[in-house]
Curated annotation (Swiss-Prot):
GO annotation, cellular component aspect: cytoplasm; small ribosomal subunit
Superkingdom field: Bacteria
GO biological process: ribosomal small subunit assembly; translation
UniProt entry tagged with the keyword Ribonucleoprotein: yes
Family: Belongs to the universal ribosomal protein uS19 family.
Protein source organism: Enterococcus faecalis (strain ATCC 700802 / V583)
The encoding gene: rpsS
Protein known as: Small ribosomal subunit protein uS19
Residues spanning the signal sequence: none
Presence of keyword Ribonucleoprotein: yes
Swiss-Prot/TrEMBL keywords: Ribonucleoprotein, Ribosomal protein, RNA-binding, rRNA-binding
Physiological role: Protein S19 forms a complex with S13 that binds strongly to the 16S ribosomal RNA.
HAMAP family, per the entry: Ribosomal_uS19
Length: 92
């Protein structure tokens, strides 16, 4: 179930302030955030935002097709290393 349209999209205030401060800057730095729940706004396009995945900050370059999605969608929290191979043949 999605968010109500009358409420509008959510973005943390501290993240929005960091993005607005970077818009006037000549050189764009990586913006570090722990807010995986924030929605990507059109003003974020072109920035690199480092999203925390529980261990480290994963750099995510924001593109136009990401607008409307959440930041956490682009920083996976779990590492999948594949299923363990069966060693039934080698045990005989």
């Amino acid at each position: 179930m999605g968010r109500s349209l009358k409420k509008g999209p959510f973005v943390d205030d501290h993240l929005m302030k960091k993005v607005e401060a970077q818009q006037g800057a000549e050189k764009k730095k990586v913006i570090k955030t722990w807010s995986r729940r924030s929605t990507i706004f059109p003003s974020f396009v072109g920035f690199t935002i480092a999203v925390y995945d529980g261990r480290k900050h994963v750099p995510v370059y924001i593109q136009e097709d990401m607008v409307g999605h959440k930041l956490g969608e682009f920083a996976p929290t779990r590492t999948y290393r594949g299923h363990v191979a069966d060693d039934k043949k080698t045990k005989r």
